[in-house]
Curated annotation (Swiss-Prot):
Coiled coil: none
Species of provenance: Rickettsia canadensis (strain McKiel)
Pfam name, any one: DUF179
Classification via SUPFAM superfamilies: VC0467-like
Protein name, per record: UPF0301 protein A1E_00140
Amino acid sequence: MSDKIFHNLSGKTLVATPHVITKGIYHKSLIYMLSHTEEGAIGLIFNRLVNHIDLKSFFKIKNDEITNPVMVPIYLGGPVEHEKGFFLHSSDYNKNLLLDFHNDLAVSSNLEISEDIAFGKGPKNSLFIVGYTAWKSGQLEEELEKNLWLVMDCNKEFIFADNPESKWHNALKHLGIDEIHFSSQIGNA
């Protein structure tokens, strides 16, 4: 057992450091932390737009009242289980929640929310995300010690911003960091 103090990051946002993670799915990624315990962690990348889908056809919603396609962006939440879909959304929608974070955000993963969004009865803000990111026990803590991630409080404006390409840059600005001056030689005090 380690003598290190465990800090629960559930409900926080991880910001990939600009020069340490230089390629792949985590390069310049933002991850909303769904769960972080001593057994491991799970999060959703929310700035990797991969496509747009029609909710009606994707979820096979059988309702003649919806005549036009309801197009929504689809985000890649991580490298694990791409067949699983999640709606990260504002907490104004509270039917059959998978997770409620009590910070104005919630997660749903059911057909009902897709139908409600298609009918205009869903949450005010939502992202449809497939797959997720997971860490085994101690793995995220090691990555944090290596300065692969910065941690910031949840910010709904970043999560639901219209331009996914600018979310990471805006998160750095919010933290008071200019990417140009960010050193690849990071140490611990």
